[in-house]
């Protein structure tokens, strides 16, 4: 089977900010960093990119700037999710002809739709665009779980091409493959189980860890895709503390602080209601960076 466009180590990119405003010069440097490190794709303004605290205009500008900075060297996936179907459609349409390779759309959060509601939500979005759509299931944040059976139904829609599955439940992967078909792209949204999902046939990881360990994550995923799981596991074990401790507080709080400590961004700050990593948690994240050999 040919390698799909969306595969390997895909970074859920942080959005750098200075004094509360998006810093586009730093964003340009981050994109270049990932191109040079071998990252296989970038998710722009997903959860890690603080999509919920950016305005629609800011979302679109950050995504378009990311595409501009990438200059065709790496596929850009746009975070376009909303818990209002109409808003998700608006954001998706605003990216027509923008150069994005596809869209990542989170399960509607807070309002807890039924499985039929989720199906109709994604169907309406897909029918509004020609852009490839990736479903994003993260029940710990949304309060709703997109079931494998619903994913199977959605896979019948031509431009719904894959899923980011962030439950960490590896039993779902073979079931989703069975229901959605072997060509349906399965991307782990859980760094701690990402390599295990690739051993079971997943095509890659949409990764938070990649923000601070881009070259390692790219190499690990390349080894996994080549079936060299022992070598991939050696890298994975070195990064395992990061996989866990970058979630010691709500993402992207720890990873922004970690990126700041590594000099990748100039400020660790986020927009309210998110706050900078607490002093109590900082030694844990610092130790994880040390275990990974990054400092």
Curated annotation (Swiss-Prot):
Signal peptide: none annotated. Transmembrane segments: none annotated. Its EC number is 4.3.3.7. GO terms for biological process: diaminopimelate biosynthetic process; lysine biosynthetic process via diaminopimelate. It is an enzyme of class 4 (lyase). It is found in: Cytoplasm. One of its GO terms (cellular component) is cytosol. Pyruvate binds at residues 48, 206. InterPro entries: Aldolase_TIM, DapA, DapA-like, Schiff_base-form_aldolases_AS, Schiff_base-form_aldolases_CS. The keyword Cytoplasm applies. It catalyses: L-aspartate 4-semialdehyde + pyruvate = (2S,4S)-4-hydroxy-2,3,4,5-tetrahydrodipicolinate + H2O + H(+). One of its GO terms (molecular function) is 4-hydroxy-tetrahydrodipicolinate synthase activity. The active site is at 136 (proton donor/acceptor), 164 (schiff-base intermediate with substrate). Gene3D superfamilies: Aldolase class I. Catalyzes the condensation of (S)-aspartate-beta-semialdehyde [(S)-ASA] and pyruvate to 4-hydroxy-tetrahydrodipicolinate (HTPA). Belongs to the DapA family. NCBIfam families: dapA. Homotetramer; dimer of dimers. PANTHER family: 4-HYDROXY-2-OXOGLUTARATE ALDOLASE, MITOCHONDRIAL, DIHYDRODIPICOLINATE SYNTHASE. This is 4-hydroxy-tetrahydrodipicolinate synthase. The gene is dapA.
